[in-house]
């Protein structure tokens, strides 16, 4: 065991050299603001991490947005309670911090800005002046950490009820129900909650009317079939026309990021499946890859291909549900029943391989739970023979229908500029003509070894274009699966590494030290080096990412989950104003979201 830990230290040193500390943007920033203006942090995120002064935040953000190859998308924004973090050597003193993750499409590079804050002065200026999609992220940061956002247009709770007290992601906020007093709903509390639910347009930034007429306000949801989950949209209407609307989320919030602080690195894997409950193994991929970056694990080729195969099966499964329910939202019922027949075949295949269906929790730190079963090739081959003809029938019978096209073409349309401003990813972004698929541009798990195309639209993302891109993505996923079938490598299904969890069984049968390692890693969890890592993947609905902070423990110090659906729902008002209520139903169907992905 001592030798294994020595090897791990050597691997740590190798990983520390993989940072983007020499990224050209660091030089550009120093040329503009001076060589001593920033603290550059060495991490395993693969992204330059730069600590900036609060007073310079907006100026630095504006500079990055106006560079020759600009950073045009605010990908993520959130906070961290730094008070209990022990491994902070070389970093600015901070009780709390806020990070801003920006993407440059032209450079295919990212940068992460961080601001250090003291507990007695928790405030940062709003980033909405530069990126409108900062709005929701800043609301959640204030809600979860109590960090004041100066100048924010509508700083209210977003995930929790308006009557909630406290800031849940602070380290001194309890993480378990048993740490709270028993809940009692008294008459006074019930009256308070009912009063908080009373709708007042002014509280949502809406006017009751004009000088000549009053507006009508309509609640769509939170229990409406076209809302695709527990989701409410408050509509401000002038007849059938939508003057404005406000999405109201949080009904499905489960505290997934807080749970990450109380689960071991290994035992958190099942929670990832339930972030976006249709994606299955696709959701496990970014988390496991981020943990493997922390550990310095390189998995065998067989593991990479198996992970890709399971991810593409779940991509097809999710896309089939999306396409069929979109058609149903427009008014046709039959395709849903056909699609569920096809999805059943996928679930049968997934169950044969993993033992589970919707939520396999099958990826492991350093590999997968077990090897592929005998006969998997036959099941996959039968599916690959079946599915292409079914796709052709969907397209011919439903998606080329003139009524469907009339209801969806030109509806909720936006261009590349709007997509980037709102943090849109996935098919919604590619429909605008921007060719950005993480599997191609930032390949992971061996995607660079597969031959497939990235479907791209003609410049405007409308409802119909988004759906048709998903159809073509299905065909490309079938291509990838065929290559997995034809080129599955031989070899182990787990990496031979001391932090592989659980370790290969043969290790536990050699001598007592390896058996002790197995016992500790399964019961308490593996101890990860104190570092930060980040991994994004092309998930079923857009880009999903995990940003993990380890403080040298068996559990994550901070687990940040960035989901695509959160950003996509924030964009709804800008895309649908001036349209009809019937157009909104089609638009919601074209986004491809589930509320668990939004609310986490």
Swiss-Prot record:
Coiled coil spans: none
Pfam families: Complex1_30kDa, Complex1_49kDa
Region ranges (NADH dehydrogenase I subunit C): 1-190
Record EC number: 7.1.1.-
PANTHER family membership: NADH-QUINONE OXIDOREDUCTASE SUBUNIT C_D, NADH-UBIQUINONE OXIDOREDUCTASE 49 KDA SUBUNIT
Purpose: NDH-1 shuttles electrons from NADH, via FMN and iron-sulfur (Fe-S) centers, to quinones in the respiratory chain. The immediate electron acceptor for the enzyme in this species is believed to be ubiquinone. Couples the redox reaction to proton translocation (for every two electrons transferred, four hydrogen ions are translocated across the cytoplasmic membrane), and thus conserves the redox energy in a proton gradient.
Protein name: NADH-quinone oxidoreductase subunit C/D
Gene of this entry: nuoC
């Amino acid at each position: 065991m001592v030798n294994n830990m020595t090897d791990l230290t050597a691997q740590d040193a190798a990983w520390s050299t993989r940072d983007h500390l020499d990224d050209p943007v660091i030089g550009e920033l120093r040329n503009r603001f001076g060589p001593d203006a920033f603290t550059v942090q060495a991490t395993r995120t693969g992204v330059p991490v730069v600590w900036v002064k609060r007073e310079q935040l907006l100026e630095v953000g504006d500079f990055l947005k106006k560079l020759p190859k600009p950073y045009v998308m605010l990908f993520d924004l959130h906070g961290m309670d730094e008070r209990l973090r022990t491994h902070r050597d070389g970093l600015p003193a901070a009780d709390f911090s806020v990070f801003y993750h920006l993407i440059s499409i032209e450079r295919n590079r990212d940068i992460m800005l961080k601001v250090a804050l003291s507990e007695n002065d928790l405030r940062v200026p709003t980033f909405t002046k530069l990126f409108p999609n900062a709005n929701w992220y800043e609301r959640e940061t204030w809600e979860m950490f109590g960090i004041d956002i100066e100048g924010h247009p509508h700083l209210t709770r977003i995930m929790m009820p308006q009557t909630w007290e406290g800031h849940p992601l602070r380290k001194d906020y309890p993480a378990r129900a048993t740490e709270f007093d028993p809940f009692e709903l008294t008459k006074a509390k019930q009256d308070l909650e009912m009063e908080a639910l009373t709708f007042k347009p002014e509280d949502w930034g809406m006017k009751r009317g004009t000088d000549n007429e009053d507006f009508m306000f309509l609640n769509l949801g939170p229990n409406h079939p076209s809302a695709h989950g527990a989701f409410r949209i408050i509509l401000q209407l002038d007849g059938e026309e939508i003057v404005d609307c406000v999405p109201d989320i949080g009904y499905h919030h489960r505290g997934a990021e807080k749970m990450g602080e109380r689960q071991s690195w290994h035992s958190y894997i099942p929670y990832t499946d339930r972030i976006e409950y249709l994606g299955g193994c696709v959701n496990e991929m970014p988390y496991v890859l981020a943990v493997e970056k922390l550990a310095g694990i390189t998995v065998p080729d067989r593991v990479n291909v198996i992970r890709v195969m399971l991810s593409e099966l779940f991509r097809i499964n999710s896309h089939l549900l999306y396409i069929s329910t979109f058609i149903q939202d427009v008014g046709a019922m039959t395709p849903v029943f056909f699609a569920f027949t096809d999805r059943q075949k996928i679930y049968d295949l997934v169950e044969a391989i993993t033992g589970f269906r919707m939520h396999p929790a099958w990826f492991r730190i350093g590999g997968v739970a077990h090897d592929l079963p005998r006969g998997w090739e036959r099941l996959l081959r039968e599916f690959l023979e079946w599915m292409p003809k079914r796709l052709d029938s969907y397209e011919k019978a439903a998606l080329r229908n003139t009524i469907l096209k009339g209801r969806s073409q030109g509806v909720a349309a936006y261009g590349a500029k709007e997509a980037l401003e709102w943090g849109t990813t996935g098919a919604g972004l590619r429909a605008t003509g921007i060719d950005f698929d993480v599997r191609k541009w930032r390949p992971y798990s061996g995607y660079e070894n597969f031959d497939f195309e990235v479907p791209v639209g003609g410049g405007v993302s409308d409802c119909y274009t988004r759906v048709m891109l998903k159809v073509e993505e299905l065909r490309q996923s079938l291509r990838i699966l065929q290559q997995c079938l034809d080129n599955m490598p031989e070899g182990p299904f787990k990496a031979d590494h001391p932090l592989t969890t659980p370790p290969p069984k043969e290790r536990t049968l050699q001598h007592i030290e390896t058996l002790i390692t197995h016992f500790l890693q399964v019961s308490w969890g593996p101890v990860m080096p104190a570092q930060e890592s980040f991994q994004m993947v092309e998930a079923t609905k857009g880009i999903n990412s995990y940003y993990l902070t380890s403080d040298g423990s068996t559990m994550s110090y901070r687990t940040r989950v960035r989901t695509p659906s959160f950003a996509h729902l924030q964009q709804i008002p800008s895309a649908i104003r001036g349209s009809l209520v019937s157009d909104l139903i089609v638009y919601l169907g074209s986004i491809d979201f589930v509320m668990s992905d939004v609310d986490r």
